[in-house]
Structures are given as C-alpha cells and as structure tokens.
Amino acid sequence: MTRFEREEWGVIGGGPLQVFDTELGRIGILICYDSEFPLLGRALRDCDIICVPSVTEAMAGYWRVRIGSMARALENQCVTAMSSVVGPAAWSDALGDSFGAGGIFCPPDTGFPETGVLAAGDICVPGWTFAEVDLAQVAHVRAEGVVLNRDHWADQTGRDGTAINVTLR
C-alpha cells in the first residue's frame, strides 16, 4: 500500500495474489504500486500476461510504475500491460489530476523488440494502447531465450541477504 493508502485510508494488504487461466493465457494483476516490488511480481511467475492498472498524481509516480512493469516483464519473461488514469478526476474526492500513459512491455529478447516496448501510449492523452501478444513467443523466450531470467531466480537464494561492506582506500 502507498503512504496515502496506509496513512489516510488505513488500507492493509490482503491475501495471496491470484493467477487467472483464460483463453488469452494465464493472467495476473499487480495494481499500481505493487508493480514496484519484485517478490510480488515473482509470485506471478507462471503468468503469460501481468496487467498493471495505475493512477499516479505525478510523472515520477508514472515512471516508477512503468519501470516496475518493465522490470516484471524482464524478470518473468512475460508481457506486462500497464494502463493509466489520466487527467482530472472531479468525480472523486480521493484523486486529483492524474498523469501517465498506457504501455505494453516484454522481455527484450529473441522475437521481441530490443527496447522491451511493444506499444506505448502518449503521456497524459486518453485512449487505448494495444499490441498483438504472441503467447508462443513468450513460451519460446522462456525455453530458448538468450537469457533465462525466470528460471535462474532461485540462483539468488543465499546471495540476497545484506551485502558485505568493503572499504577501498
């Protein structure tokens, strides 16, 4: 939960994340701020697509969510689909002006754009952002990619504690 959600609304985290088996593939959801946490993304490692709906009241917030969405696509070798509320929200007491853009992100690997961006909407312009997603390509990258980030996650175990401080003089 963001500071506002915790401090103003008293919101607390819920139960485990869910994976939905659909005709479009296995889909998970990381809502906005959740996309900024690798372990939440890792819980969705079996998803082909992770949806990231968001609302941010500053461009810095948009970029944090976008960078998180791109990182989750890289780590899980999947596609992430980010949507953003944009513009004023006079209908809501909780929201001010919102900034952002939609984006469809992928691992920058074989068969995908080297930028990791399948599609990107215009900043603060309402509209749809969409791309063709080839689930066979997702499966191919997971099995035969240049790197196998998703499979090598366990290699971090034991190295993910506090780093050793080394003084160089």
Segments (PLM) and residue ranges:
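Active-site catalytic loop in hydrolytic enzyme cores
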Residues: 1-45, 58-71, 147, 157
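A generic secondary-structure signal marking the coil-to-beta-strand transition
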Residues: 16, 26, 77, 127-129
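C-terminal beta-strand edge segments of enzyme domains
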Residues: 19, 86-169
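CN hydrolase (nitrilase-like) catalytic-core segments centered on the catalytic cysteine
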Residues: 35-126
